[in-house]
């Protein structure tokens, strides 16, 4: 009849507990890891939601501020009698003389990239940012809204190269006569840069290709290639 040495009995007792204890510890570690991951996920989601809300709020504030600035600019132009006469007569040369320097100043100091004089029939009379292009029908939403309501209308719209532009359109009436419409706009890239610096975050604007015409897509690609080529050719000391 065999007998177990007293020295081996504690080892057998320990062996019986090691397996269950190891499983218990492994289970506890798994639960702990899941809990930590869940907490980190909630913190990350909350941080993302707070950042998104901050971006949306700041973006709306900047759009509102710039819209008021553009409206003030248009009102100043509408009390310029020389511009009134030039617009009423459809005199492109006079418009260029009266507003050319103003547009250059607005572009350099306030990032204004678009300025239009548009006839009552929504045909472009003069583009300060592109004088050679005129006589085309303009069918943008903001212009249609301004015509239907006969009140200022503004909003973000895609430009001809797929760039987002804040546009403001207002009817121009003089002594009850509708002379046409004034449209002013700014591409919003500088607003995004300001938000990046203010909130220390990266922003990326994506445009669904389905909403672009082939011509817009190609012009956008050409513009992007030009920017990349310019940055690659820039000397580090010139940055």
Identify the residue ranges that each predicted region occupies.
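Intrinsic low-complexity, intrinsically disordered coil/linker regions enriched in small/polar
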Residues: 190-239
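Residue-level signal for short hydrophobic patches within transmembrane helices
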Residues: 19-23, 56-59, 63
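Short clusters of small/polar residues that mark proteolytic maturation junctions
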Residues: 129-130, 157, 183
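Generic short beta-strand
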Residues: 115, 169-170, 203
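Extracytoplasmic/periplasmic sensory segments of membrane signal-transduction proteins
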Residues: 50-59, 66-153, 196, 207-215, ...
């Amino acid at each position: 009849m065999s007998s177990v040495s007293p020295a081996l009995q504690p080892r057998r007792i320990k062996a019986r507990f090691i397996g269950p204890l190891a499983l218990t510890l492994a289970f506890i570690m798994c639960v702990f890891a899941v809990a930590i991951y869940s907490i980190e996920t909630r913190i990350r989601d909350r941080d993302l939601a707070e950042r998104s809300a901050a971006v949306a709020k700041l973006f709306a504030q900047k759009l509102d501020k710039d819209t008021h600035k553009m409206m003030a600019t248009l009102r100043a132009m509408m009390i310029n009698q020389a511009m009134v006469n030039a617009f009423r007569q459809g005199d492109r040369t006079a418009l260029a003389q009266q507003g050319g320097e103003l547009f250059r100043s607005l572009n350099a100091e306030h990032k204004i990239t678009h300025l239009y004089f548009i006839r009552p029939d929504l045909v472009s009379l003069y583009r300060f940012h592109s004088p050679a292009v005129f006589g085309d029908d303009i069918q943008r939403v903001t212009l249609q809204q301004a015509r239907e309501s006969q009140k200022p209308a503004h909003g973000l719209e895609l430009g001809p190269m797929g760039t987002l532009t804040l546009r403001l359109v207002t009817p121009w009436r003089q002594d009850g006569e509708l002379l046409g419409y004034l449209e002013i706009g700014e591409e919003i890239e500088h607003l995004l840069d300001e938000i990046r610096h203010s909130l220390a975050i990266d922003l990326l604007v994506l445009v669904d290709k389905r909403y672009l015409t082939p011509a817009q897509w190609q012009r956008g690609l050409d513009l992007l290639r030009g920017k990349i080529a310019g940055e690659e050719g820039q000397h580090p000391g010139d940055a």
